[in-house]
Amino acid sequence: MLNALYDYAVRHELSLPDGYAKKTVVAYISFSSKVDDYVEIHMGDDREIPCPDIGSLANGKEKSNIIVEKRSVVIPDEENAKSTFFRNALVELGQVEPDAALCAEILSNADVLEKIRAHLDVNKIKPANRISFMVDGRKLHNSPHLLEWWKIWRQGIMPPKKGDLAPCLITGELTTPVATAPSIKGLRVVGGHASGDALICFDKPAFCSYGLKQAANAPVSETAMGAVKAALDELISDAPILCGMKFVHWYDRDVEMENDPFFDVNFLGLGNADQEGEEADDDDTAQKEIAARSRADQVIESVKTGTTAGSLDAIYHILLLSGVGGRVMVRRYEMGEYESLQKNLDKWNRDLALVHPYAQGLCKPLKLTGRLIRLLKYQKNDRKIFDRMSKELSGITPAVLTAILGGGRLPDAVAIRALAYIRSKLLINDEEQTDDNLDGWACQWLKVWLLRNHERSEEHLNEYYNPNHPEPAYHCGAAMAIYGEIQHKAMPEVNVNMAQRFYASCIQTPALVLGRLSQMCVHHLAKIDTKFYQNLYRELLERVHTAIGPVIPTTLNLEKQSYFALGYYQMYAKMRKDRMDAVHKNKEEA
């Protein structure tokens, strides 16, 4: 994983010089080399600027970052050790950069400092906001002399590297491992810290081995780890959120753009640099990489929408990340060939195929987030549904994604939760509720779970109701759907239908409940005026009870409850289709 991220950073030229980090500058204090006491404030933008950074040393009371630092350090209300360190660094930089010397000189003038504070207050620059300097319109962090000076100056303030050489886990080269790896940013929305989270962290004795301390337990070079950080920072920034996790994905190489129908499809917004005022990159390699990401994103989209993805000759990498206690939690890491991924996605879409709940073709495609909602208990007008997904589904979502992308088995929790969703939705006594059938997307979870976890299901479990299915529980569900339809035909204005009253008990103990429903059916059939429908329902019940067999199951386990739900669902859809076909036939004859 680390090596793949490093390769991504090298390919995109994302790695920064040693000791550099990307920062956002809120405001620039502008000076003039020609006009004394000239002070203006120029507001920054949201772009992250590569700047020198001394890392954890800046967390102490004596040292600070240089060039770009918080207002409380650069322009303090009272002089302190950190502000003195900042100004002294400008003095030393001033030996090779005249603009830095001018800034250091101005910062030693108390009258000008008061003027600067007033300007900062007017522009509402807070003590925690990062600021920097401009001289005659030149930004100090863009100085051509800064990098070479920084390499030498940094060696004087950084503690000497101790320890033996060790092979870097990322590159394999011998290196003196960094004591503390840089933090990864962008996970705040999924439980991380605003200041970043540690990907490699050995701050507790229990995490260490063989007497090694800190990051020496996972030795990485400063340059290689900086590249990994740059790659993750970029990938995380535009990664979608799924159940409280960042869905990060990338590919190992470019693909040919020729005859690429997916080039303009861009799920995460790449390829729009020209629309943001930046010069568009005409380099073939960059365009191919955009094409690869576009095609790759379309693959992920196909998981959600059911569309077919095109061929891509590349290796995919997928990370599910969240932040916990200041650390990066890798929930799942997947990699593999794209052709295999495409086959598994096609299998996923085939397994999902299920009749529409009201016989209007097959169920419509649904985004993966919408499907995952069917694994939560139903709550009407739930405004915190996504918070619930983050809390309740973060544990099984990685396993679900692995099953989708790898073509494997689904966790049993999927079937348990889908059944719970169906029951909870039926129990909502809502006068405005018009759904008589079960939720189609929840039943799709049950169908896929049965197909993948029980091999004998594949032969008999189809998109539509199968009258020859060998499982009695399947036909028990179909029988209940018929009883419910008979009740609806006899008493269309009833407030609580049969499914709402008896479904939860019938799916667990069908032998106890179906007998009672059969007795009620006699009363309901007598209320139906049309002999045609009476005979139709009797014939349906006779066929279904013949399929159940001589003994109705006493209790149903998880597998058979899933069959029960699908039998109910598919029989209801079948009756709806038969009714629509009859109406259409009567219209044609008329």
Where do the model's predicted regions map?
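Extended alpha-helical scaffolding segments
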Residues: 1-156, 175-590
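Beta-strand elements of modular eukaryotic interaction domains
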Residues: 159
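Residues immediately within or flanking Cys/His clusters that coordinate Zn2+
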Residues: 162-165, 196
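Short cysteine-rich clusters marking metal-coordination/redox-active sites
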Residues: 165-173
